[in-house]
C-alpha cells in the first residue's frame, strides 16, 4: 500500500494509464472507457448482475439508471457534467431488479456516501452486501443542470439540443456540436455555476472507491486508473488478462501523475480553507 507524504490520493495499490480495447466503447467513451468496460466485463463474466450508471435523458440531463446488459451500459456511456443521484436507485436495483452483485459508479462524494451506507445501512437493509464494485471518477467540481445549461447556452452560445459532447481539459470547458463546431470558455468562468457543496469536498480522486479513474495525467483517449482495493485489483487484472484493457505504466505517459497530484492537492488546500471559513461563521458543513 502506497502513501504520499502529502497524501493527495488516499491509499492505493497501483496506478496505471489504460484504455478499453472494445471498439463499441471507444466510439462513445469520454476518454479511455474504463467505467463502461469494467461494467461490461463484470456483466459478461457474472461478476456483476446489475450496474448503476448515469444515463442521458436528453440534452445532457443525467438520470440514474439500473443497467443489466452490456447494451444498456453502452447507451449510458460518456461523462455528464451535471449532478446525477445514482445512489437513489440502489434500493430499486435490489428490490425491483433483484440484483445480487451491483456495480456503482459515482463522484467522490457519492463514493463516500456508498461507503457510509455500507457501514451504517439505516434505511438500506439488505443493500450493503449486494454492492460488489465501486468505481469512482475524478472530480474537481460538478454543476446542477440549470447551471450547466447557462454555461453552454449563455457563455458558449450553443443550444443544448445541438451538443454531442462536453469535456474539461487544458483549463477550459469544451462543447462539441452536431454541426462539427467546437466552442470553449476558460474554466474559471464556470466557477459561479458550481454545486455549492463541491466547495467543501476535499476528495479529487475518489479515494474510497475500489477503482478510481479520470482523464487527467494520461494522453488523449486514455485514462489514469488507481487500483485501490483487493476487489478492484482482482477485476482490473482479469480485464487486462482477458484483453479488455490496454495498459501502460503511468511513468511512461505524459503529462503523468504529477498533474493529478497538483490538482488533488489544489482541491484539498482550497476547500479546507472554505471549510475553516464556514466553521468560523458557524455555518453547517454539508459533507
From Swiss-Prot:
Catalyzed chemical reaction(s): oxidized coenzyme F420-(gamma-L-Glu)(n) + H2 + H(+) = reduced coenzyme F420-(gamma-L-Glu)(n)
Enzyme class of the recorded protein, top EC level: oxidoreductase
The enzyme's E.C. designation: 1.12.98.1
A molecular-function term among this protein's GO annotations: flavin adenine dinucleotide binding
Pfam families recorded: FrhB_FdhB_C, FrhB_FdhB_N
Requisite cofactors: Ni(2+); iron-sulfur cluster; FAD
Family matches, as InterPro entries: Co_F420_Hydgase/DH_bsu_N, FRHB/FDHB/HCAR-like, FrhB_archaea, FrhB_FdhB_C
Alphabetized UniProt keyword annotations: Iron, Iron-sulfur, Metal-binding, Oxidoreductase
Free-text remark on how the cofactor is bound: There are 12-13 Fe atoms per alpha/beta/gamma unit of the FRH.
Assembly mode: Heterocomplex of the form (alpha(1)beta(1)gamma(1))(8).
Described function: Reduces the physiological low-potential two-electron acceptor coenzyme F420, and the artificial one-electron acceptor methylviologen.
NCBIfam families, alphabetized: frhB, PRK09325.1
Family: Belongs to the FrhB family.
Name listed for the protein in its UniProt record: Coenzyme F420 hydrogenase subunit beta
Name of the gene this protein is made from: frhB
Amino acid at each position: 500500500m502506497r502513501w504520499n507524504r502529502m497524501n493527495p490520493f488516499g491509499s492505493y495499490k497501483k496506478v496505471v494509464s489504460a484504455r478499453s480495447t472494445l471498439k463499441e466503447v471507444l466510439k462513445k467513451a469520454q476518454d479511455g472507457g474504463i467505467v463502461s468496460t469494467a461494467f461490461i466485463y463484470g456483466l459478461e463474466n457474472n461478476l456483476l448482475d446489475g450496474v448503476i450508471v448515469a444515463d442521458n435523458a436528453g440534452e445532457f440531463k443525467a438520470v440514474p439508471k439500473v443497467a443489466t446488459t452490456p447494451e444498456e451500459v453502452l447507451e449510458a456511456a460518456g461523462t455528464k457534467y451535471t449532478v446525477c443521484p445514482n445512489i437513489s436507485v440502489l434500493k430499486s436495483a435490489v428490490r425491483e431488479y433483484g440484483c445480487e452483485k451491483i456495480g456503482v459508479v459515482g463522484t467522490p462524494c457519492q463514493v463516500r456516501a456508498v461507503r457510509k451506507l455500507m457501514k451504517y445501512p439505516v434505511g438500506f437493509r439488505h443493500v450493503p452486501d449486494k454492492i460488489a464494485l465501486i468505481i469512482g471518477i475524478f472530480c474537481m467540481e460538478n454543476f446542477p443542470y440549470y447551471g450547466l445549461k447557462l454555461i453552454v447556452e449563455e457563455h458558449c452560445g450553443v443550444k443544448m439540443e445541438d451538443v454531442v459532447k462536453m469535456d474539461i481539459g487544458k483549463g477550459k470547458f469544451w462543447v462539441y456540436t452536431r454541426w462539427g463546431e467546437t466552442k470553449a470558455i476558460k474554466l474559471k468562468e464556470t466557477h459561479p455555476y458550481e454545486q455549492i457543496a463541491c466547495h467543501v469536498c476535499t476528495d479529487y480522486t475518489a479515494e474510497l472507491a475500489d477503482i478510481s479513474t479520470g482523464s487527467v495525467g494520461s494522453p488523449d483517449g486514455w485514462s489514469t486508473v488507481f487500483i485501490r482495493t483487493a476487489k478492484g485489483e482482482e477485476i482490473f487484472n482479469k480485464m487486462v488478462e482477458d484483453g479488455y484493457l490496454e495498459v501502460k505504466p503511468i511513468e511512461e505517459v505524459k503529462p503523468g501523475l504529477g498533474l493529478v497530484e497538483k490538482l488533488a492537492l489544489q482541491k484539498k488546500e482550497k476547500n479546507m480553507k472554505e471549510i475553516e471559513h464556514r466553521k468560523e461563521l458557524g455555518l453547517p458543513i454539508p459533507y
